[in-house]
């Protein structure tokens, strides 16, 4: 089996097939996982606020990239993340049993502690040529990692977004169709539309 991790600010920008990703993972046993947030387009590391070098890619299938995360930098060197990646349960389930968590930050922090055990056995990571997901960090909704970098735009506070929703407005997700972000995390303006009456 496989497991897909997602967080509440993850946005999909293009169609993808989980069934295809499962097959690719099965055919690339040296890969730890498949990142939906990485690609040749992710040339900037938002969390560190700097450009990131691209790893040396190979292409095991059409539109798919493979790289050695143990020889990479920044986002490309961070293989265990919970924002938008798919992993095999065989590798992840034993870790999940050992991690004490009650939110995504604690889960990711707990998983990262075990990354060293995969350096020899699973040094590769897979992704699409162009990422199909990114996180839009418009606000901070948790209190355990207050140093997480987020937008300072006051119109996207939790209270402001809740007020818009209560007034019948929702985020227009079509606005993000085919967006090609330069980073795994990228602040983007939100577009709103009136919620359809049911």
Identify the role of each PLM range.
Residues 4, 32-34, 126:
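Hydrophobic/aromatic beta-strand patches that form the interior of the parallel beta-sheet core
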Residues 14-101:
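Conserved catalytic core of nucleotide-sugar-dependent glycosyltransferases
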Residues 84, 90-198:
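C-terminal catalytic/acceptor-binding lobe
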């Amino acid at each position: 089996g496989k497991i897909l991790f997602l967080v509440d600010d993850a946005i999909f920008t293009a169609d993808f097939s989980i069934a295809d990703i499962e097959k690719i993972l099965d055919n690339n046993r040296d890969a730890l996982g498949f990142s939906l947030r990485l690609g040749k387009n992710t040339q900037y590391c938002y969390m560190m606020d700097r450009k990131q070098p691209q790893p040396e890619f190979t292409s095991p299938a059409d539109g798919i990239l493979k790289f050695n995360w143990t020889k990479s930098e920044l986002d490309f060197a961070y293989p265990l993340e919970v924002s938008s990646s798919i992993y095999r349960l065989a590798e992840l389930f034993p870790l999940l049993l050992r991690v004490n968590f009650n939110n995504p930050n604690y889960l990711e922090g707990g998983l990262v502690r075990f990354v060293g055990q995969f350096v020899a056995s699973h040094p590769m990571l897979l992704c699409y040529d162009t990422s199909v997901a990114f996180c839009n960090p418009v606000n901070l909704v948790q209190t355990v990692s207050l140093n997480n970098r987020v937008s300072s735009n006051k119109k996207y506070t939790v209270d402001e977004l809740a007020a818009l929703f209560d007034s019948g407005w929702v985020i227009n997700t079509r606005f993000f169709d085919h967006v090609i972000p330069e980073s795994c995390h990228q602040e983007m303006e939100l577009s709103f539309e009136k919620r359809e009456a049911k």
